[in-house]
Amino acid sequence: ECSVVFLAAGAGQYLRSTLLKRGVSHMATWMACGFLAAGLYIAVVNVLVAAGWVSPNHMIGFISSVLFLVPGFPMVTGMLDISRMDFLAGISRLTYVGLLLISASFAVWLLGSLFHLPLATPAPLTLDPTLDLLLQVLSSGVAAAGFAMLFAASPVACVWGGVIAAVANPARIHMVEAGMPAHMAATIAVFGVGILAEIVAPLHQRKYTRISLSVPAVVTMVPGVLFYRSMSHFASGDMYSAATG
């Protein structure tokens, strides 16, 4: 699933950069990229299933192929604007975020409905706890560094964003697995991200702002899969599943 998601999301990101360079509307771009990424995931997995190499239950990962379309930077900065009482900037950014998420969600819902794809939560992996932790650290760091690159951050800021996420995000996951409410775990983890960013920034004479260091790490905690799944349930009229994720 991760390999196919890598291929599908890479193709979607290439299309997004191409369309944005040509001045195409952001909403149309997000929708087209959602169709390409999710559609490519579905096509590749179907080919693998037809060849007998994988089982059909791997189709459940198709939503992960569009996570790169979560506009994390404007989402986080919009909420920061609201917290500073800058409602004009905050509402503008969050409205932009909402429109893009709806555009991408339409692609997820339509493809999921056409191909009758599962929207259930995947079964947890049965891995050695040490290996599981190492994979969480690695994937969190790579994801945050990748998001920082999408935000046009400098290489040093990308590396530090990955390091901060590699510490904070696995800690959040383990707090949730230990029984802590997800929102409380996220609050503690995000607070930790801010503290780490404040520690790192002076190391480079504050050449890199706390925002550029912390936002990529925070974006890895955005529940994109839950959002897209809920929007798909909502579009299908299943309000209970939409509300519960």
Description of each model-found segment:
Residues E1-V222, R229-G245:
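Alpha-helical transmembrane segments and their membrane-interface boundaries
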